Design a protein with these regions (language model features):
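Short, hinge-like loop/turn segments at secondary-structure boundaries
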Residues: 34-37, 134-135
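Residue-level detector of anion-binding/catalytic polar loops
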Residues: 15, 51, 147
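A conserved pocket-lining segment of Rossmann-fold NAD(P)-dependent short-chain dehydrogenase/reductase
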Residues: 18-32, 41-65
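C-terminal substrate-binding subdomain of Rossmann-fold SDR/epimerase-dehydratase oxidoreductases
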Residues: 55-57, 63-168
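Residue-level signature of the cytosolic catalytic core of signaling kinases
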Residues: 31-35, 148
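Active-site Tyr-X1-5-Lys
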Residues: 1-17, 46-48
Length: 168
């Protein structure tokens, strides 16, 4: 699809734009067992007062993004000045990169006594280790001013509040 976007832009002048998202974290959608879903499930278990069993190794970095940033990035790209866009097939966008151990530490600051243990799934481990530690979003930053608004700390605070309200 990305090369087709380039072709239609160069051949017919079609204004095509797209993004490559990292793992998306949302308080709206329940975790469904995907490789990045541990980063959503941890908040649900923390709010419930449960010990969280993480199936990703503690040292694996993965790029993540909070849903509000993902939505804003999409709108910002669609509203960007086409004259400033050099790329047409797809833009990498990034927000934060962390390990399960890093997110555990942040959650524990907000939920004292939170506990997490590891039971690494070999298939998910292999998948997660095959991904890049971080995405290079230089083109998005330079061509249309992409900049995330949420970091791990602010996302954690918001996720815990919204998940708690949802579970009431």
């Amino acid at each position: 699809g990305e090369l087709l976007s380039n072709y239609y832009h160069s051949r017919f002048g079609v204004d095509t734009r797209s993004v490559r998202f990292p793992g998306i974290i949302s308080n709206v959608t329940l975790p469904g067992g995907g490789t990045t879903d541990y980063a959503v499930e941890i908040y649900y278990e923390a709010v419930k007062g449960n010990k969280f069993v993480c199936n990703i190794a503690p040292d694996v970095y993965m790029d993540m993004m909070y849903m509000p940033d993902a939505l804003r990035a999409t709108v910002d790209l669609m509203e960007a000045d086409p004259a400033k866009l050099k790329h047409r097939n797809s833009f990498n966008i990034a927000a934060m990169s962390f390990t399960p151990e890093i997110i555990r530490e942040v959650v524990e600051r907000h939920v004292p006594g939170f506990q997490m243990e590891y039971n690494v799934d070999p298939v998910k481990d292999q998948i997660s280790r095959s991904w890049p530690n971080s995405l290079d979003d230089t083109c998005a930053r330079e061509e249309w001013g992409w900049k995330p608004e949420w970091d791990l700390e602010s996302m954690t605070k918001d996720m815990l509040e919204k998940v708690a309200a949802k579970l009431k």
